Amino acid sequence: MAKDIKFSEEARRSMLRGVDALADAVKVTLGPKGRNVVLEKKFGSPLITNDGVTIAKEIELEDAFENMGAKLVAEVASKTNDVAGDGTTTATVLAQAMIREGLKNVTAGANPVGVRKGIEQAVAVAVESLKEISKPIEGKESIAQVASISAADEEVGSLIAEAMERVGNDGVITIEESKGFTTELEVVEGMQFDRGYASPYMVTDSDKMEAVLENPYILVTDKKITNIQEILPVLEQVVQQGKPLLLIAEDVEGEALATLVVNKLRGTFNAVAVKAPGFGDRRKAMLEDISILTGAEVITEDLGLDLKSTQINQLGRASKVVVTKENTTIVEGAGDTEQIAARVNQIRAQVEETTSEFDKEKLQERLAKLAGGVAVIKVGAATETELKERKLRIEDALNSTRAAVEEGIVSGGGTALVNVYNKVAALEAEGDELTGINIVLRALEEPIRQIAHNAGLEGSVIVERLKNEEIGVGYNAATGEWVNMIDKGIVDPTKVTRSALQNAASVAAMFLTTEAVVADKPEENKGGAGMPDMGGMGGMGGMM
């Protein structure tokens, strides 16, 4: 396919038009008085959102060169979202400001490489200054404040704070759509995995169709059990103790399953058989997790262990097990706390090392199951459109809160970026490097300018006053007051602000050093591919 090539000034100008198109659509959503953007969906109702990355991903421009500019800025939003989970609109605003200012200077004759060096120096100092003014997040109230600001909803803030308190900072918090109108929190204590009983005859509560085992023994094996003789010796030992048994195996079928069911129905012995969770290597890892949590040994030929010679001291214990048709929940496993802690640290290390998003998600699920439990926020709304928008906001708020727990918080509302202004301005440089530093200085003001603009105010007045205020004091655009931002709970996670600045600078530096842009030439539609003209089928009149 033929290519279209543009060079230097012409190339950068074309891309800038794309940058502006995307950034102008995204930045109207910034701040407490930000507006919404409506996105057309080919199927179903349109999506109304104020989430920067969602808007950025939807934008596709007709002109190939403009589209490349738009995609560069969309990458800033996407990368910030991946790293910090929020701050995508701020990142987009920063990137647009740096690219615009940079392009003015490069057009006027500045050397892009020198400008890039200045930008990198300024951002490094700004990031260090952000870390210095960052405060650690402590207590449920602080967590609720961060979540409330991100979701623009105090109810959501308190729900997320409660969820994190219940399952711990590493716990899995999932967000699901609810059938009702209200948004609720449901917490599953202990370890839950998605495998239910092997036979419905094993239930102890026929109304709820669930089997509840109090203080059971737990047998964990990776074998398929078909013959009752294999597990008879250990069954007899458990019967003597008068306790129920949870049997986790690759599968339990045939005579073995029938015998367990018959004994349950006769009231002789209560046992519930469950298939092992996961597949392949993940199954092996999850069985080990269960064994460590309950204090069991995994009966596997890999370790030279045989079911027939299994003793009762090789089984695990738990205070309670609840098995439904689809899930098994083990509450208060009797495993050694030191071994559980070591396993948690091992999984944490694997999370840090893995590059696969899927593997990371699965490892974090395992981590949560060992470390505390799973919380589910069930999102409710009156209409499907409102439900989608609300779910997106809650996801952002959750990511934002996790980022705050990780690296602390700074003053929100664009205040923190202006707070580091003086440190960056104190940098000594000359020539094009100084130009690069000045570009970053101008960009640091842009988020607060945009927040003020969205609230119907003059940004320059707010920025100039903010530079003279003490660190932490800022403008609350929601109420129109000057307040101590952290005291009032108007905060941003340091990680979000840092990531937005670093990613914006990275793309701006690449943009300014671009000297040629190559795109596919649009194909001309010659109209020759269709059916030949048949003259309105008039020539076929003789066939009547």
Curated annotation (Swiss-Prot):
Domain of life of the source: Bacteria
Alphabetically ordered keywords of this record: ATP-binding, Chaperone, Cytoplasm, Isomerase, Nucleotide-binding
Annotated binding of ATP, by residue: T29, L30, G31, P32, D86, G87, T88, T89, T90, G413, N476, A477, A478, D492
GO molecular function: ATP binding; ATP-dependent protein folding chaperone; isomerase activity; unfolded protein binding
Assembly and oligomerization: Forms a cylinder of 14 subunits composed of two heptameric rings stacked back-to-back. Interacts with the co-chaperonin GroES.
Its job: Together with its co-chaperonin GroES, plays an essential role in assisting protein folding. The GroEL-GroES system forms a nano-cage that allows encapsulation of the non-native substrate proteins and provides a physical environment optimized to promote and accelerate protein folding.
Stored NCBIfam families: GroEL, PRK00013.1, PRK12849.1, PRK12850.1, PRK12851.1
Protein name (record): Chaperonin GroEL
Organism: Bacillus licheniformis (strain ATCC 14580 / DSM 13 / JCM 2505 / CCUG 7422 / NBRC 12200 / NCIMB 9375 / NCTC 10341 / NRRL NRS-1264 / Gibson 46)
